[in-house]
């Protein structure tokens, strides 16, 4: 399936659901949820957003909900776009979970990606999350093989 609204375009699995949210301060968010509860979320922020502050806030929020939270610096490179911030591991209802937050700065906006899944599903879903992020960069930012 393809999401293509409000200047944001990406592909997502057919059996996932989409929720959109916007705020008066210009922040637009989309969450794609899998039937099993895993999700990938994208938030478009103003270009001058402080990613370090956003990541610190996310870490504090997660730590408040999951006291055993472990956070690690992390980064990815997709089509020459550097996405950095953090990986998280935590327990919830006797299940271990993994989450990632990645940030991408452009001249027009800042983008924050957040994805989360139970560890038993992470090895499969991590590739789905990355494909969704890659399709966003290719479709919205215009980088990648299809834009040559």
Give each language-model segment a name.
Residues 51-52, 94, 119-123:
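Loop/helix-junction capping segments adjacent to catalytic residues or to phosphate/diphosphate-binding pockets
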Residues 2-56, 60:
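Secretory pathway targeting signatures of secreted, lumenal, and periplasmic proteins
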Residues 1-5, 32, 76-77, 88-90:
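Short acidic-hydrophobic surface loop/beta-edge motif
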